[in-house]
């Protein structure tokens, strides 16, 4: 009986050890499978994060380049506009410097020479030019054209003059601003060639 108990104890031990080994192997296998699943999931998430980060970096670089190009275009346009403005201002100053009293008197008389003798005409000058030219012009003009011509002050004129039929149907602008604008439009294509950056 003693052998039977001993055999029974050995058998229980052996069965317990076998069961423990089986459970242990099963736990280890499950742990390995879970670890592999966790590793695969982590690798997949890492790959997705890497792809997302690379896309964000690419997009950021692309947007930065686009913003840089736009800023450069804006700078070029702004510089071109500033240069045009300076050029136009210099042109206006040059035209204004030519408009002295003698030149204005000659120009007004020549314009009136080609105008119809029967027209009622208003000549508009700035106040300082009226003070300088009024008596000379009135004498020259009235002798040729009679009393149908009036010389009037006009605050909107810096240098130069405007000539208008009294009924308002015909109008010529010989102000320094208008002449500078005409010259600028004529010179603008050449000016663009000079400052062209290509």
Curated annotation (Swiss-Prot):
Keywords: ATP synthesis, Hydrogen ion transport, Ion transport, Transport. GO terms for molecular function: ATP binding; proton-transporting ATP synthase activity, rotational mechanism; proton-transporting ATPase activity, rotational mechanism. GO terms for cellular component: proton-transporting two-sector ATPase complex, catalytic domain. NCBIfam families: PRK01558.1. Belongs to the V-ATPase E subunit family. Produces ATP from ADP in the presence of a proton gradient across the membrane. This is V-type proton ATPase subunit E. It comes from Borrelia duttonii (strain Ly).
């Amino acid at each position: 009986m003693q052998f039977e108990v001993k055999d029974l104890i050995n058998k229980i031990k052996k069965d317990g050890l076998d069961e423990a080994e089986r459970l242990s192997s099963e736990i280890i296998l499950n742990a390995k499978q879970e670890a592999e699943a966790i590793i695969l999931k982590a690798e997949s998430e890492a790959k997705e994060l890497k792809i997302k980060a690379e896309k964000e970096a690419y997009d950021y670089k692309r947007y930065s380049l686009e913003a840089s190009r736009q800023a450069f275009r804006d700078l070029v346009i702004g510089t071109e506009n500033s240069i045009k403005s300076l050029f136009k201002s210099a042109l206006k100053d040059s035209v204004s410097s030519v408009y002295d009293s003698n030149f204005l008197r000659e120009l007004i008389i020549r314009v009136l020479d080609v105008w119809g003798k029967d027209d009622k005409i208003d000549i508009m000058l700035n106040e300082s030019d009226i003070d300088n030219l009024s008596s000379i012009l009135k004498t020259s003009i009235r002798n040729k054209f009679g009393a149908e011509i009036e010389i009037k002050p006009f605050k909107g004129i810096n240098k130069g003059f405007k000539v208008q039929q009294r009924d308002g149907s015909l109008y010529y602008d010989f102000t320094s601003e208008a002449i500078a604008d005409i010259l600028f439009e004529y010179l603008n294509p050449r000016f663009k060639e000079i400052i062209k950056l290509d």
